[in-house]
Amino acid sequence: MLRNIYVYIKYITIGSDKLNIIKQNLDKEVNLFIPDDIEEIDFEDSLVITDVPEDEFKMQAEACGKDSCEVKAAGFNTKPGDGYSYVCQTLDMGISYYRLVYARLTGEPFVVAETKNLLIREMTTKDLPELYAVYSTLEDCRYIEQLYDYDKELEFTKNYIKNMYGFFEYGLWLVFEKKSGELIGRAGIENREIDGVTCREIGYLIRRDMQHKGYAYEACQAILEYASDELGIQEMFAVIDKTNEPSRKLAQKLGFELYAQTDDGPDLYKFVFG
């Protein structure tokens, strides 16, 4: 878990106003430090933002007796050849972005949102057994595409984490009930071609015994907020079977409006962020 952010700037000047912006964007769970020397940096549970090229930074860390393998750092105004996977062009990013960078660098699943009752995060391959249990409660639901056999699903999940989460920074996420800690469903954002254009589609499913508690609505509300505030998405679609009345009612409750219909296919609903 990210607990500390160190802004270690050596070659450029950062005004106090910029540092104050970072402080304003953090929350009470994350501390901000402005070290004068690399010796002052504790790499455990920390993200370092620095203008020092990666190779040079790791050499400095090793010279101080620190393990450079523990370094989780993002470049600030660094060049593509400086080695960092993530580069911050500005320091006024929100805490969600810093947590995302830290998750990518550590390989931990990124927590997308936390609501009153739910926690929504990226999935890992370790979640597959629980995910199969969720889908087993929905085997008779014709609106849901079932998972592959385990070996194929495992390979699919590995590629999904790398190519969907890693490239688009969104996808289908896992939904956990906070009070029990149990996996109760999936919800998130997928890509779909509509009118020849790649658009974003919201998707959701809830474990059978956890339905009718308002969890799908709560999860989708949080996802729409994240899509607007963190991803800058301006519109979202929902593709709903004509006979899927619960899903249609949920979409309309969320603010989706009918966009297009076909004679023999699903209906298309659209949400425009105001």
For the regions a language model picked out, list residue spans one by one.
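GNAT-family acyltransferases
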Residues: N4-Y8, I21-Q24, Q89-D209, Y226, ...
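Conserved acetyl-CoA-binding loop-helix of GNAT-fold acetyltransferases
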Residues: Y204-I206, H212-D229, E245-K253
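Asp-based, Mg2+/Mn2+-dependent phosphohydrolase catalytic module
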Residues: M1-A113
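Short, high-confidence coil segments that cap the C-terminus of an alpha-helix
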Residues: F43-D45, Y170, I233
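Conserved SAM-binding loop
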Residues: V48-T50, I120, I240
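Conserved beta-strand-loop-alpha-helix junction that forms the acyl-donor binding cleft
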Residues: V52-E54, A238-R248
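Conserved acetyl-CoA-binding loop of GNAT-fold acetyltransferases
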Residues: C64-D67, Q252-T262
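Conserved GNAT acetyl-CoA-binding A-motif
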Residues: E230-V239
